[in-house]
Amino acid sequence: MTTKSDFSDEEWSRIIRAPFVAGLAITLADPGGPFETAKESMAALKSATNPPSREQLLADVALDVQAMVQQRHNPLQGYKPSHSEALGTQVLGELRDVQAIVSAKATPQEAEAFAGWLVSTSQAAAAAAKEGGFMGFGAEQVSQGEQTMMGQVRQAVGG
């Protein structure tokens, strides 16, 4: 059983922000307006506080995320990808790196559960708000850009 104490402070900071980075990947794939972005962010937050598995590692992450929310701390604090054309690539690289950290120290089952959690978080963010259209008409629940990014998130974390 892997717990928070198995990771350095820097590693743990990256691990607890990973669900939010997975949600950010979706927002970057097809940026909508402020309401769509807020819905996607809230979906990522909900997923980050409700892991789909009972693995101790995921429970520890969720508890720390809940504490951050209660203290009104930004879960993406310290994560500042550069503003460039390669922003999506940087976000996927962060997810890949965090998954490598988890895979190196956690059991295979925990690493798989963590990867699945990141994928499900990206799916929740994508499904949270319709994209495109006009005043909701003709909009897609999950845009082509978001579908592509979900596949890239899955590939990045090996999920």
What role is predicted for each listed range?
Residues 1-159:
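Small-residue-enriched hydrophobic alpha-helices in membranes
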